[in-house]
Amino acid sequence: MTFITDLETELRQNSNEELAIPMENYMKNKFSFLGIQTENRRTILKTNWHKHKEEVQTNFRSICWELFNKKEREFHQCAIDILMKEIKKKYLP
């Protein structure tokens, strides 16, 4: 899946260790973080989503599962964003 590899590459390139440590402490060290703030994470997700729109629409469930299986919390949050938007588009009036 090229969407996941592109998203992972861009998120890892924009990681910030200085922000990751306080984020992990805030969540009581239950999750690892890349240190990407919400606004930046959403813009990265949005640009990659537009590049791979058809792939995301057809495989959103498997993409979300794969993102949830990654260690860092930012991937989990991207999966939640994808799931919410795709479910609203497909199943809600």
Task: State what each model feature region is.
Residues 1-93:
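Surface-facing alpha-helical segments and adjacent helix-coil boundary elements at the starts of domains
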